[in-house]
């Protein structure tokens, strides 16, 4: 089973396409949608929804996959549920870069402060990251340097921020899920 968490643009048609591509790894791909506008509510909703979905699966190794803001949540919700996660062009600092886009971006900082201290050290090797060299939204070199001590980093020379084509990375994602 793969949980797919969309980015800030929840209605993008690319979400369906990415889910279809992920079905080459596992036919059971589930969209876990969230508002993107209310971080504290989103966190509670995502925790409950993932726990509920896991009860209805016999997969011994479910995987979280998130793009952009979805990767922010995939890392945290995956950690809290003991799941591996794939972070694609993760938005690591929504408290800074979501100003003007959501009502209370400061809630992300509050979530970070209330999360398990040094959770990345406790989550080492349980996530892999895929970054676009040509990401038009974030400085992925900087973000990769924040995560490289904890997770493996793969680079893509072609895809933009929303990462519409996962095909080149599906074998690595599958191997990571099954390892």
UniProtKB/Swiss-Prot annotation:
Entries under Gene3D superfamilies matching the protein: alpha/beta hydrolase (3.40.50.1820)
UniProt cross-references to HAMAP family, sorted A to Z: UPF0227
Family stated for the protein in its record: Belongs to the UPF0227 family.
Protein name: UPF0227 protein Sbal195_2522
Organism the protein comes from: Shewanella baltica (strain OS195)
């Amino acid at each position: 089973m793969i949980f797919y968490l969309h980015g800030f643009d929840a209605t993008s048609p690319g979400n369906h396409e990415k889910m279809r591509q992920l079905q080459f790894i596992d036919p059971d791909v589930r969209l876990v949608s969230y508002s993107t506008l209310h971080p504290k509510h989103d966190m509670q909703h995502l925790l409950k929804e993932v726990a509920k979905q896991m009860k209805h699966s016999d997969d011994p190794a479910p995987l979280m996959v998130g793009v952009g803001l979805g990767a922010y949540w995939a890392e945290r919700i995956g950690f809290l549920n003991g799941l591996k996660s794939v972070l694609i062009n993760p938005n690591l600092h929504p408290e800074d870069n979501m100003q003007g886009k959501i009502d209370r971006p400061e809630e992300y900082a509050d979530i970070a402060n209330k999360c398990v201290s040094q959770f990345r050290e406790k989550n080492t090797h349980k996530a892999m990251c895929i970054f676009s060299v040509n990401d038009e939204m974030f400085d992925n070199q900087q973000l990769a340097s924040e995560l490289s001590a904890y997770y493996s980093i793969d680079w893509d020379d072609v895809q933009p921020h929303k990462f519409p084509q996962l095909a080149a990375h599906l074998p690595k994602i599958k191997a990571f899920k099954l390892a």
